[in-house]
UniProtKB/Swiss-Prot annotation:
Binding-site residues for K(+), renumbered to this chain: S194, T199, Q200
GO MF terms, alphabetically ordered: 3-methyl-2-oxobutanoate dehydrogenase (2-methylpropanoyl-transferring) activity; metal ion binding
Role played: The branched-chain alpha-keto dehydrogenase complex catalyzes the overall conversion of alpha-keto acids to acyl-CoA and CO(2). It contains multiple copies of three enzymatic components: branched-chain alpha-keto acid decarboxylase (E1), lipoamide acyltransferase (E2) and lipoamide dehydrogenase (E3).
Gene Ontology annotations of biological process type: branched-chain amino acid catabolic process
Gene3D superfamilies reported for this sequence: 3.40.50.970
Gene name in the database record: bkdA
The protein, known as: 2-oxoisovalerate dehydrogenase subunit alpha, mitochondrial
Keywords associated with the record: Metal-binding, Mitochondrion, Oxidoreductase, Potassium, Thiamine pyrophosphate, Transit peptide
InterPro entries linked to this entry: Alpha-ketoacid_DH_E1_comp, DH_E1, THDP-binding
Catalysed conversion reaction: N(6)-[(R)-lipoyl]-L-lysyl-[protein] + 3-methyl-2-oxobutanoate + H(+) = N(6)-[(R)-S(8)-2-methylpropanoyldihydrolipoyl]-L-lysyl-[protein] + CO2
Main subcellular location: mitochondrion
Binding-site positions, thiamine diphosphate: Q145, Y146, R147
One GO cellular component term: mitochondrial matrix
Family: Belongs to the BCKDHA family.
Length: 441
C-alpha cells in the first residue's frame, strides 16, 4: 500500500490541494485497495485495473480463438455468415486466385532461367489476398510487404503491370528503380513496397492519422508477416496507432515461417493476436487465413470499426507459406516435404473455394482447364512483350528526387553522361530508351 500511495503522490505532487486531500483520506481511513481506487476514480486518476492486496503472478489464461466458417470441403457452418456473393463475383475471386497461382509458377521458373532477377510466390496464401482486398474500398490506402500480389490484382494491377516491373522496362511504373516484387501504384492507392522489413507499419499509421485529421471516411491497411512482428517498428506502430486512435488495420499474415525461422521460435504466448488487447488495448481478431469467406468477413468488420470508431484493429490470419521464401531460398533445408504437402493438400485455399462453387454448380473441370490455359497464355505473352521493351531512360535515375533538380544533381547527371560517352562499349546502352539521343554530341 505504501508503494501505491507514493506512486499516486508522485502523479499529483504539483497539485498541493489534491495532495492535501489524498493525505487526509489516507490518514483518516484505512489505506485499503478500495480506498485508493475510490480516490483515484474521484480525482480522474483512474486506471483500468483493480488494486489488490493479494500477491499473485499473472500467466496466460486463455487463447484468442480462430474464426472460420467454411471447411475444406467448401461447406459453410453458419449460412447466415456466408457473404452470399453472386455467382459472377465468386467466379471472379476464384479465377483471380487461380491466375495468381499460375503466374507465380511461371515467373518462378522464369527467374530460374535468368530472365528476371528475383521473385516471390504466394502459394497457399491466395485466400488472404482476395478475401481481404474484396472487403476494402478503392479509396483505402494500402501498405504492403512483398507477398500480397493478389491484393493488387484484385484492385486492378494487371499482369502486364506486374511483369513490366519484374523486367524493369520503360513501362514499369517504378521506372526501373526497384527490384522485382516492389510494386506501387497511385491509381489503386498502393504505396510502393520497400525492402527493409516492417518500415511500412509506422508509415501506415502516419497515413491513417492524416486520414483522420482530414476527416476522411477511409482507412489504411498494412500487411506484414509474423516475422516482421519481431521488429521494433512493429511496437512503435502499434503503440502510435493505439495512443492516437488511428483508423489503421494491421493485417498479419502468420504463414508459420519467417524465411527459415519457424513461428515457434519467433514468439511465446498467444502469437501476434495476443499482443493486441492487453499489450495495446487494440481490438483484435484471429482468422483462418485459408478460408476466404472468414477473411472477407473479418476484414469487412475491421474496416467498419476503423472508419466508424476511428480506432486501429489487429488481424492475425493463420495460414502457411507453401512455396520457398523467395527465389533466393531453398526451404527443403529446414522443413520436410510431408509438412508442406499436409498444408497444400489438407488446407488449400483454392480447392476450398472450388468445393464451395461445386456445391452450387457454378464451376466445372472444363472451366478450370480453360481458365488455367488462358492464364498461362496471358502471362507468357506478357512476358515475351515485356522482354522486348527498352529499359527506362538513363535520365530517370535523376528524376522524381526533387521538384526541381538541384545543382549537385544536375552535375551528377552531367558526369554520368560524360562517363558513358567515354566508355560506351562497357555498357549495354542500346537497351535503354533515348540512350542515342542522350549521348549524342
Amino acid at each position: 500500500m505504501i508503494s501505491q500511495s507514493y506512486r499516486i503522490l508522485s502523479r499529483i505532487s504539483r497539485n498541493n490541494e489534491l495532495k492535501k486531500t489524498f493525505l487526509t483520506n489516507l490518514n483518516c481511513k484505512s489505506s485499503s485497495p478500495s480506498i485508493i481506487r475510490s480516490f483515484c476514480k474521484k480525482q480522474n486518476l483512474d486506471e483500468n485495473f483493480e488494486y489488490t492486496n493479494k500477491l499473485e503472478v499473472q500467466e496466460l489464461k486463455h487463447y484468442i480463438p480462430c474464426y472460420t466458417i467454411m471447411d475444406q470441403e467448401g461447406v459453410v457452418s453458419k449460412p447466415d455468415q456466408d457473404p452470399n456473393f453472386s455467382k459472377e463475383e465468386v467466379i471472379k475471386m476464384y479465377t483471380t486466385m487461380l491466375t495468381l497461382n499460375v503466374m507465380d509458377s511461371i515467373l518462378y521458373d522464369v527467374q530460374r532461367q535468368g530472365r528476371i532477377s528475383f521473385y516471390m510466390t504466394s502459394f497457399g496464401e491466395e485466400a488472404i489476398h482476395i478475401g481481404s482486398a474484396a472487403a476494402l474500398e478503392m479509396s483505402d490506402t494500402i501498405f504492403a510487404q512483398y507477398r500480397e500480389t493478389g491484393v493488387f490484382m484484385w484492385r486492378g494491377f494487371t499482369i502486364n503491370d506486374i511483369i513490366n516491373q519484374c523486367c524493369t522496362n520503360e513501362h514499369d511504373l517504378g521506372k526501373g528503380r526497384q527490384m522485382p516484387m516492389h510494386f506501387g501504384s497511385r491509381k489503386i492507392n498502393l504505396q510502393t513496397i520497400s525492402s527493409p522489413l516492417t518500415t511500412q507499419l509506422p508509415q501506415a499509421v502516419g497515413s491513417s492519422y492524416a486520414q483522420k485529421l482530414a476527416g476522411e471516411k477511409n482507412c489504411t491497411i498494412v500487411y506484414f508477416g509474423e516475422g516482421a512482428a519481431s521488429e521494433g517498428d512493429f511496437h512503435a506502430a502499434m503503440n502510435f496507432a493505439a495512443a492516437l486512435s488511428t483508423p489503421t488495420i494491421f493485417f498479419c499474415r502468420n504463414n508459420k515461417w519467417a524465411i527459415s525461422t519457424p513461428s515457434k521460435e519467433q514468439y511465446k504466448g498467444d502469437g501476434i493476436a495476443g499482443r493486441g488487447p492487453n499489450g495495446y488495448g487494440m481490438k483484435t481478431i484471429r482468422v483462418d487465413g485459408n478460408d476466404i469467406w472468414a477473411v472477407y468477413n473479418v476484414t469487412k468488420l475491421a474496416r467498419k470499426i476503423a472508419v466508424e470508431e476511428q480506432v486501429p484493429v489487429l488481424i492475425e490470419a493463420m495460414t502457411y507459406r507453401v512455396g520457398h521464401h523467395s527465389t533466393s531460398d531453398d526451404s527443403s533445408r529446414y522443413r520436410t516435404v510431408e509438412e508442406i504437402n499436409a498444408w497444400k493438400e489438407g488446407k488449400n485455399p483454392i480447392s476450398r473455394l472450388r468445393n464451395y462453387m461445386n456445391h452450387k454448380g457454378w464451376w466445372s473441370d472444363a472451366q478450370e482447364k480453360e481458365t488455367i490455359a488462358n492464364a498461362r497464355t496471358t502471362v507468357r505473352e506478357s512476358l515475351v512483350n515485356a522482354e522486348k521493351q527498352y529499359k527506362p531512360s538513363i535520365n530517370e535515375i535523376f528524376t522524381d528526387v526533387y521538384d526541381k533538380p538541384t545543382p549537385n544533381l544536375i552535375e551528377q547527371q552531367k558526369e554520368l553522361i560524360e562517363h558513358l560517352k567515354l566508355y560506351p562499349d562497357e555498357y549495354p546502352l542500346n537497351q535503354f530508351a533515348d540512350s542515342k539521343l542522350i549521348l549524342k554530341d
